[in-house]
């Protein structure tokens, strides 16, 4: 995948359009411990994408119902 280098500034609408078109995944993991005792553990994966982009990639990795049904 090639990286495009653009010298002009982007508007907020262009940035949001690009994020929805390509998608972005934020993976976070937090653990709070006190004296070796785990008090809190949080794991989160946030996916930001358009429905079309999500379905395209979800089908490619087998996360949709249509991908789970074998072809007859």
Curated annotation (Swiss-Prot):
Protein name (Swiss-Prot/TrEMBL): Gas vesicle protein A
Organism: Pseudanabaena galeata (strain PCC 6901)
NCBIfam families: PRK09371.1
Top-level taxon of origin: Bacteria
Disulfide-linked positions: none
GO terms assigned for molecular function: structural molecule activity
Subunit-structure text: The gas vesicle shell is 2 nm thick and consists of a single layer of this protein. It forms helical ribs nearly perpendicular to the long axis of the vesicle.
Major localisation: other
């Amino acid at each position: 995948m090639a990286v495009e280098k653009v010298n002009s500034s982007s508007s907020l609408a262009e940035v949001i359009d690009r994020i929805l078109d390509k998608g972005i995944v934020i993976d976070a993991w937090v653990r709070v411990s006190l004296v070796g005792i785990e008090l809190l553990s949080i794991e989160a994966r946030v996916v930001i994408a358009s429905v079309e982009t999500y379905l395209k990639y979800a089908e490619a990795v087998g996360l949709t119902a249509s991908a789970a049904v074998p072809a007859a």
